[in-house]
């Protein structure tokens, strides 16, 4: 599933192309994804101007102007396999898993606009369209925790949110009400960099441990964004290119390999271990992470 770095990468790629552009044509090829699409979705989008693109947690938020309803927000969640790819028009025939295609007006001095295609093989993504005034109260956004790259996320705030939690720290960090946007890959990588075991009880991650974990999270996310995210299965950037952060994984997907943090001997120690927590694979070094 695309996590914060992948969604942020897509946001930046789309922003460079479609910010300020008008949606002149919108083609919708099915009535639903994970949930039903909004009523009159394509008709309501057509003719609106893209005023800006933002991200909250794993959600892409597109601000639209020009509607009789007032400013609108188009919320996009990519689910497990959703992609948004932009290219020069005109649009061709839709592929078997292309569910929404929109075309913009041409940028100044150019003959063709941009065509953006939403493709989703598993159809686990979803979209919504609602008045901007309802943004903070939207059910998908209202209870989210702080942004890990924002000014409101520091060791003190993380310690406060983890206080009293007796779940493993891995599960706590995946809780979107604790911190927004983290997923399995980046939690594994962040805990490794901080030297914290994913089995450790969340409430014990305070003080110096929280002081190590917060910059580790920030560094992992920042580096992943710079690399265009991680392409393991379906994810591609908005230009159709793969992300490259998967080549920088220290522990994720590296079961049985030597730990880059302690150079342990896999024959003697087993190297990087894989365990299952809450139904998800966790990768870590039991010797390096405590």
Curated annotation (Swiss-Prot):
Catalytic residues, per the record, are 2-3, 58, 280
The FPG-type zinc-finger regions cover 250-290
State the Gene Ontology terms under molecular function: 8-oxo-7,8-dihydroguanine DNA N-glycosylase activity; class I DNA-(apurinic or apyrimidinic site) endonuclease activity; damaged DNA binding; zinc ion binding
Report any one BP term from Gene Ontology. Answer: base-excision repair
- Cofactor binding note from Swiss-Prot or TrEMBL: Binds 1 zinc ion per subunit.
Listed under catalytic activity are: Hydrolysis of DNA containing ring-opened 7-methylguanine residues, releasing 2,6-diamino-4-hydroxy-5-(N-methyl)formamidopyrimidine; 2'-deoxyribonucleotide-(2'-deoxyribose 5'-phosphate)-2'-deoxyribonucleotide-DNA = a 3'-end 2'-deoxyribonucleotide-(2,3-dehydro-2,3-deoxyribose 5'-phosphate)-DNA + a 5'-end 5'-phospho-2'-deoxyribonucleoside-DNA + H(+)
> For DNA, which residues are the binding ones?
97, 122, 165
Cofactor needs = Zn(2+)
CDD domains, alphabetized: EcFpg-like_N (cd08966)
Known InterPro entries for this protein?
A: DNA_glyclase/AP_lyase_DNA-bd, Formamido-pyr_DNA_Glyclase, FPG_cat, MutM-like_N-ter, Ribosomal_uS13-like_H2TH, Znf_DNA_glyclase/AP_lyase
The record's EC number reads 3.2.2.23, 4.2.99.18
Report keywords, A-Z: DNA damage, DNA repair, DNA-binding, Glycosidase, Hydrolase, Lyase, Metal-binding, Multifunctional enzyme, Zinc, Zinc-finger
Q: What NCBIfam families has UniProt attached to this entry?
A: fpg, PRK01103.1
Q: Which HAMAP family match?
A: Fapy_DNA_glycosyl
Family as reported in the entry's similarity comment = Belongs to the FPG family.
Q: What is the role of the protein in this entry? A: Involved in base excision repair of DNA damaged by oxidation or by mutagenic agents. Acts as a DNA glycosylase that recognizes and removes damaged bases. Has a preference for oxidized purines, such as 7,8-dihydro-8-oxoguanine (8-oxoG). Has AP (apurinic/apyrimidinic) lyase activity and introduces nicks in the DNA strand. Cleaves the DNA backbone by beta-delta elimination to generate a single-strand break at the site of the removed base with both 3'- and 5'-phosphates.
Q: How does it assemble?
A: Monomer.
Name of the protein described by the UniProt record: Formamidopyrimidine-DNA glycosylase
This protein's gene is called mutM
């Amino acid at each position: 599933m695309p996590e914060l770095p992948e969604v942020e990468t897509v946001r930046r790629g789309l922003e460079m192309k479609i910010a300020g552009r008008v949606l002149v044509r919108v083609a919708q090829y099915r009535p639903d994804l994970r949930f039903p699409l909004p009523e009159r979705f394509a008709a309501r989008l057509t003719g609106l101007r893209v005023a800006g693109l933002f991200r909250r947690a794993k959600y892409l938020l597109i601000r639209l102007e020009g509607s009789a309803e007032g400013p609108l927000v188009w919320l996009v969640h990519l689910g497990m396999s959703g992609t948004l790819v932009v290219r020069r028009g005109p649009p061709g025939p839709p592929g078997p898993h292309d569910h929404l295609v929109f075309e913009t007006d041409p940028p100044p001095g150019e003959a063709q606009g941009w065509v953006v295609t939403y493709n989703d093989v598993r159809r686990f993504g979803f979209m919504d369209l609602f008045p901007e005034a309802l943004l903070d109260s939207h059910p998908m956004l209202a209870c989210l925790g702080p942004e890990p790259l924002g000014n409101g996320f520091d060791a003190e705030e993380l310690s406060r949110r983890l206080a009293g939690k007796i779940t493993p720290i891995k599960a706590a960090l995946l809780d979107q009400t604790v911190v927004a946007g983290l997923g399995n890959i980046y939690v594994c990588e962040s805990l490794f960099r901080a030297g914290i075991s994913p089995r450790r009880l969340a409430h014990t991650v305070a003080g110096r441990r929280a002081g190590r974990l917060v910059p580790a999270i920030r560094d992992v996310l920042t580096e992943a964004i710079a690399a265009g995210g991680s392409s393991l299965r379906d994810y591609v950037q908005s230009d159709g290119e793969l992300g490259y952060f998967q080549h920088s994984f220290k522990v994720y997907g590296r079961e049985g390999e030597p730990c880059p943090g302690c150079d342990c001997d896999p024959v003697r120690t087993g190297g990087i271990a894989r365990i299952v927590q809450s139904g998800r694979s966790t990768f870590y070094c039991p010797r390096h992470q405590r």
